[in-house]
Amino acid sequence: MEEGQYSEIEELPRRRCCRRGTQIVLLGLVTAALWAGLLTLLLLWHWDTTQSLKQLEERAARNVSQVSKNLESHHGDQMAQKSQSTQISQELEELRAEQQRLKSQDLELSWNLNGLQADLSSFKSQELNERNEASDLLERLREEVTKLRMELQVSSGFVCNTCPEKWINFQRKCYYFGKGTKQWVHARYACDDMEGQLVSIHSPEEQDFLTKHASHTGSWIGLRNLDLKGEFIWVDGSHVDYSNWAPGEPTSRSQGEDCVMMRGSGRWNDAFCDRKLGAWVCDRLATCTPPASEGSAESMGPDSRPDPDGRLPTPSAPLHS
């Protein structure tokens, strides 16, 4: 083999080796460039991230500062509200205490007022009772004086049988039988206007006379319950010495029927004073006239005229209260 050929064969591996080295160098340069680029990118990313973090930190710091201020302000407001709430609670407690005090005072005043009203009512009731008793006593005294005067006149020969027109005489008393719808008190006023009073009945004979002449539908009479002692008293102040109650009567002590009517049968029945009846009976003492001189019998009253034998009638027995 020739020498030239041997040199070419030897040169061939050397060329290949140089070509590989060049490729390795180029690869290293490319790799270095890539790493440099990557590092640059990392540095840029780090710088950008650092800036962002700084901005976030600054923003967070500002937010924290603002939040702290807000918290401080809120805490101050909260403390002020708490103080105000405490003050309001104290004022509310004071108001409640004042309300309770006023309530106690109001209750005490109510008790005192009720006591005063009860005392006033008791005083008025007592005064009314005393006034009624005094009025009844005065009326009874007047009645007694009138009866005594009549007894004296009768003993002196006076004739006591004169009655006003439309009045009927019976045993030295005059009776008026009124007609018209009235309550008990208005019937009493009607009798007062005629200088009389609602009738008081003291004997069976008087009761028979009234039963004969009174209305058959019922009439008011002068008996009533004043609620002083739970007993009935005549309007002239006299007590009940004769009674003619219907069976089961009276019932006013429990039902408030404080006035008395006379039924058509003559029996008595207690009734509500505001009940309206169509009749009532008044009475008054008859007027006495002096005795007529002998021979003037015509001037004497009808009960004083001589009988067919020429004798004067015996005077009626005196009335007793």
From Swiss-Prot:
Post-translational modification as stated in the protein's UniProt record: N- and O-glycosylated.
Keyword presence, Membrane: yes
Positions of the record's site feature: Cleavage: 149-150
Tissue specificity as recorded in UniProt: Detected in urine (at protein level).
Biological process according to GO: B cell antigen processing and presentation; defense response to bacterium; Fc receptor-mediated immune complex endocytosis; Fc-gamma receptor signaling pathway involved in phagocytosis; immune response; macrophage activation; positive regulation of gene expression; positive regulation of humoral immune response mediated by circulating immunoglobulin
Molecular function via GO: carbohydrate binding; IgE binding; integrin binding; low-affinity IgE receptor activity; metal ion binding; pattern recognition receptor activity; protease binding
Lipidation (S-palmitoyl cysteine): 17-18
Stored Pfam families: Lectin_C
All ranges on the Extracellular side of the membrane: 48-321
Disulfide bonds: 160-288, 163-174, 191-282, 259-273
Transmembrane parts of this sequence: 22-47
Cytoplasmic side: 1-21
Residue ranges of Sequence repeats: 69-89, 90-110, 111-131
InterPro entries: C-type_lectin-like, C-type_lectin-like/link_sf, C-type_lectin/snaclec_domain, C-type_lectin_CS, CD209-like_CTLD, CTDL_fold
Keyword annotations from UniProtKB, A to Z: Calcium, Cell membrane, Disulfide bond, Glycoprotein, IgE-binding protein, Lectin, Lipoprotein, Membrane, Metal-binding, Palmitate, Proteoglycan, Receptor, Repeat, Secreted, Signal-anchor, Transmembrane, Transmembrane helix
Coiled-coil parts of chain: none
Chain positions covered by the region annotation Disordered: 66-85, 290-321
Membrane disposition: Single-pass type II membrane protein; Lipid-anchor
Residues in C-type lectin domain copies: 162-284
Binding annotation for Ca(2+): 249, 251, 269-270
Quaternary context: Homotrimer. Interacts (via C-type lectin domain) with IGHE (via CH3 region); this interaction regulates IgE homeostasis. Interacts (via the C-terminus) with CR2/CD21 (via Sushi domain 1 and 2).
Biological role: Low-affinity receptor for immunoglobulin E (IgE) and CR2/CD21. Has essential roles in the regulation of IgE production and in the differentiation of B cells. On B cells, initiates IgE-dependent antigen uptake and presentation to T cells. On macrophages, upon IgE binding and antigen cross-linking induces intracellular killing of parasites through activation of L-Arginine-nitric oxide pathway.
Miscellaneous: There are two kinds of Fc receptors for IgE, which differ in both structure and function: high affinity receptors on basophils and mast cells and low affinity receptors on lymphocytes and monocytes.
Protein name: Low affinity immunoglobulin epsilon Fc receptor
Gene: FCER2
